[in-house]
Structure formats: structure tokens, C-alpha cells
Amino acid sequence: MTWLEISGTVGRVAACLGFFIAGMAIFYLLTKVIYRIPEKQQLERLHEPGKFRNAGIVIFGGVAAVLFTGFFGMGLQGIIYFLFLAVLTVVTFIDMDTMEIPFMLNVIIFVMGVVSLILQFVSDTVPGSEFLAMDEVTIVSRLIGMICISLPLYLIVLFIPEGFGGGDIKLMFAAGFLLGWKATVVGFFIGLILGGIYGVICLVRRSHGKNDHFAFGPFLSVGLAITLFCGNIIMNHYIDFIKAAMNPEI
């Protein structure tokens, strides 16, 4: 059930307000986590947290909570995906500040994948556990998702060491197990496009030197967040398009 299905305008507004406040509270805590997770040797590389940035994170959390409960409902799937977004938010800002993605954050995402797989199994086998229902992502899709992007990135790094960071590879590995291969591929290419656009802008403005790099984790995080809503749909349409192109009607 989503807040959109609540009867009465007052009830829907109250539900939205409650989710908005809850989301803001959770993301307010994230503004503290973002500056405490990095290791001590990285602290000198962190700039002082800006009030406007923190306020933006908090407001984003409130809006996201309303969107997620409206789209995914109030079951555990919506909760897991919202927590996934929360982790991606932490990944984004820590990577922006330190050019590194803490290993523990990727572990948390992988654990979310394990939990979602267990919930999916329980909801399919135990009567009356529909509230535990998750998207039907098969174990095969999850296993393929773990390597469909992370393995090519790893091979690229073997030949071009500065091509991608190890944190980026681990992020796609963990996210692949949570989302499955379709959403993971779509999320990666969305991130790749966004990162490419940013790189071109930096090149035009010459804000980065030839040997300088920018964090790619934030773009991957945005791509993965977007794909929560439409990743499988985009991939399914793409597959149907390819099939139609390969087998045109005579």
C-alpha cells in the first residue's frame, strides 16, 4: 500500500508530511555520518561541511521518502530501497571529498542484497507474508549482476590503472547483487553518460589538468538511484527492440 491509496486528502497529506519528516531525520543523521566514516588519514582532505549542502541533503531525504513510499509502498521493499538510496548518498559525498568509497559501505549494500533475497524467498513460500514481497530478481540475475559491470571494470583497471577506482568496482559488484543485472547495466550506463558530460564540461572549462581525476562514484550512485524506478523497464524495452530489429516481420 502506498500513501496514494490512503483515502481522503487529509490522510494523504498527513502521510506525506510524516514520511517527509522521517526522511529528513534519517538524512540529517547522514550528514553526520558523511564526515565521520572516512579514516583519520583522510580527514585533512575534507573541507568543512557547508550549511547549505547539509540542508540540501536533509531536504532531499524528505522528498525521497515521499517519492519512495508513493512508488514502492510501505512494505520492506520500499524501506530497503530507501536505505540503499541513503547509502548511495553517503557514497556520493564521501567520494567527492576523499576520492575513495569506504569498503564498509559496499558491504552494507551487499548485505541489503542478501536480505532482499531472503525476503523474496519468504514472501514466495510463506502464506500471509505479502508485505515482505520484493521485486522478482532471480538468483541468477543477481549473480550475473555482480560481475556484468564489475568484472569489465576490473579488466580495464588492469590495463589502465587510473581508469576506475577500486571502490567503483566494489560498488557495482554489491549493487549488482541487490538489483540484478538489468538494473545494474542501466544504472551504470546512466552514470557513465552523466560522468562523461561532466568530464566534457571540465575539459571545456579547463578546471582539471590532464592528469587530474574526478570522483566517478557520485555518477554511479545517481545512475543506480534512477534505475530503482525504471531500470528493469528500460532494459526490457531495449531487449524487445533488439529482438524486433533482429526478427523483422516479413
Predicted feature descriptions by range:
Residues 1-250:
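A membrane-topology feature that recognizes alpha-helical transmembrane segments
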